[in-house]
């Protein structure tokens, strides 16, 4: 909890300064998870997406809505040309969200974690 307080206190909310932006996913006053833009590269106009949905909030379309909203911000306001996500191959629920939203698998990352490979999903914005 101290690490979280430190992160919140030190974050400016400026993706250009911090290189990342973390947004909490809230529904009716309850926190359902968070979504991040990180590895922000303004020169090449790309960023990674990370997302966590609390177990009690899964299966309700919250992740899909969060990805759509972060895309609007990334492609519309930040003028990014590419977003990507690295998803463990076992995390089929998350891969389903990205596939449904038009991301394409571009590579398999072998032994990405101790337990699993990962899939690199990309969406190029024309």
Predicted feature locations:
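Active-site rim helix/loop that mediates acceptor-substrate recognition in acyltransferases
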Residues: 1-20, 27
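Acyl-donor (CoA/ACP) binding surface of acyl/acetyltransferases
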Residues: 26-126
């Amino acid at each position: 909890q101290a690490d979280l307080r430190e992160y919140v206190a030190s974050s400016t909310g400026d993706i250009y300064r911090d290189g990342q932006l973390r947004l909490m996913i809230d529904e009716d006053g309850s926190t359902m998870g968070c979504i991040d833009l990180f590895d922000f590269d303004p020169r090449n106009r790309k960023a990674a997406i990370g997302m966590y949905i609390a177990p009690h909030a899964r299966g309700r379309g919250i992740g899909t809505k969060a990805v759509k909203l972060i895309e609007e911000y990334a492609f519309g306001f930040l003028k990014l040309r590419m977003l990507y996500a690295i998803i463990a191959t076992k995390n089929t629920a998350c891969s389903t969200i990205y596939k449904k939203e038009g991301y394409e698998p571009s590579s398999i990352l072998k032994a990405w974690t101790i337990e699993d490979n990962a899939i690199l999903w990309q969406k190029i914005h024309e």
